[in-house]
A protein has these predicted regions:
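Class I S-adenosyl-L-methionine-dependent methyltransferase catalytic core
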Residues: 2-335
Length: 335
């Protein structure tokens, strides 16, 4: 079980990446991660276009309509942490973040919270199957290019744990400044019972129907908030807890999708960014994640414009370290 009552101990920087780094050395001043300069630069592109294959139990995980690819989460984890550091996902779903920690080049520890028992069971099944894959040698991942070369990958779930419960109840159990990185995919908005064509329109426009359904009956589920304002208020409480448990100088990533509800576009990412900033998490970037192959639906056709939202926002925040009287931290200018 990952420990949260003491700071983790990062592994000293290595001289080069053993897999996927092209032999490029790690800069001796790099204390954030174990990436080469080339890998670091590639990560900072503000638009990511991905088409992930079905791997790591995707056929099971896809039951969750917003499951996140472990390869994507591993990429984030490898940039914002070092081997052995502790990652938190307070809205873990079927465990994409935890699986990403287990396949990271240099495994990380990870804690996840999930309110829905069904998703926890799926995660546990996926872990068991991944451990048994290729006679215990770990998964064989597809080559996705220089940013994610794939190949044989060690699967080490010994440091990951998914806890069943409400994030707002479990977050206070974590020690202050005990987490090295937060990576999460919260409910995007208040769930609507009907987001596509229904009733008499369902028969006429079957291509507008969807099997996307993740609504729980638990009132603690943020997606069951009374309205959008209540949802934002509860997310503000979450951000306050994340700012408390995150170590100074470390990062939090929140993946969120804007919405179109009641005839208007909802800038959910901007609203959540404002709540995070109010809680003390400083905005550092917005990486646009475009999921190639997203199915397009004729929502407003043939009368009005309604967007097909095929991208998500990977919002990057930082809990700034305290500055000295000279406006510096750790002997270096704050950035």
């Amino acid at each position: 079980m990952p420990k949260t009552n003491e700071p983790s101990r990062p592994t000293p920087p290595t001289s080069s990446r053993e897999d996927g780094g092209g032999g490029s050395s790690v800069h001796p001043a790099n204390v954030l991660n174990e990436l080469s300069g080339e890998e670091w630069l590639y990560f900072t592109k503000s638009v990511w276009s991905t088409a992930y294959p079905s791997e790591l139990g995707h056929e099971r995980r896809r039951a969750h309509g917003a499951n996140k690819p472990p390869r994507l989460m591993a990429r984030l984890i490898e940039f914002f942490t070092r081997t052995g550091e502790l990652v938190l996902d307070p809205f873990a779903g079927v465990g994409g973040t935890l699986l990403g920690a287990a396949i990271a080049r240099g495994p990380r520890r990870a804690i996840g919270f999930e309110i829905e028992p069904r998703w926890v069971r799926i995660f546990e099944t996926v872990v068991a199957e991944a451990l048994a894959s290729r006679d215990g040698e770990g998964p064989l991942l597809a080559d996705l290019g220089p940013a994610d070369p794939g190949g044989p990958r060690r699967f080490d779930p010994s440091g990951i744990e998914l806890r069943l419960g409400d994030a707002l109840e479990l977050l206070p159990t974590l020690a202050e400044a005990s987490i090295d990185f937060v990576a999460t995919d919260p409910p995007y908005n208040v769930q609507l019972r009907q987001t596509m064509a229904g009733g008499p329109l369902a028969a006429r426009f079957p291509n507008r129907r969807t099997d996307y359904a993740m609504v729980t009956n638990d009132p603690a589920d943020l997606a069951n908030s009374a309205d959008y304002g209540a949802y934002l208020d509860r997310m503000g409480c979450v951000f306050g807890e994340l700012a408390r448990v995150l170590r100074p100088g470390r990062y939090a990533v929140v993946i969120v999708r804007d919405a179109y509800q009641d005839g208007r576009y909802v800038f959910t990412a901007a609203d959540l960014a404002a709540r995070a900033a109010a809680a003390g998490l400083v905005p550092k970037g917005d990486l646009i994640w475009y999921q190639a192959g997203t199915r397009l639906r004729p929502y407003g056709y043939p009368r009005v414009f309604v967007p097909n939202i095929a991208h998500q926002h990977i919002l990057v925040f930082r809990k700034e370290a305290r500055r000295s009287r000279r406006g510096e931290r750790g002997g270096r200018p704050a950035r």
